[in-house]
Amino acid sequence: MKKILKSCFICLIVITIINTTAFAAAPNDPANPQANSYILKTTVAVGAPGNGVIEVACGVTGTGRMDKIGISRITFCKADGTRLESHGYTESGYGYLMGYNKSNHNAVVQFQGVAGESYYAIVYFYASKGNGSGGVTMESSVIKAK
């Protein structure tokens, strides 16, 4: 009887672990609105190194190896929501925002602001594989330029 109970208990733990892992990474999970069928995880971190410069570090992880994955566009805004400038990966000098044939991609983008003013960024992530694609939009926190 002890062996049967022990086996049932172990099976229950294994099933719980498998289900927890599957749901934690499940695309279109309401608990993780950043996830979809192509994008598993996104990160945006903002910093103010000095001289009015704002730096935004962006990262995106796909649900597997993607044909194309990265940042399709980044828009810099004043804290009041006024949009200042926007850059896409197809523009000259911004090709590094997109990666190809990989499962994740990271990039850092700088914006020249004015010391003492507060800014934030809106980052548009993109991933595609075959004929399908998905996108996620994220805002950074507001930061004051130094």
PLM region descriptions:
Residues 23-146:
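Mature extracytoplasmic or otherwise solvent-exposed domains
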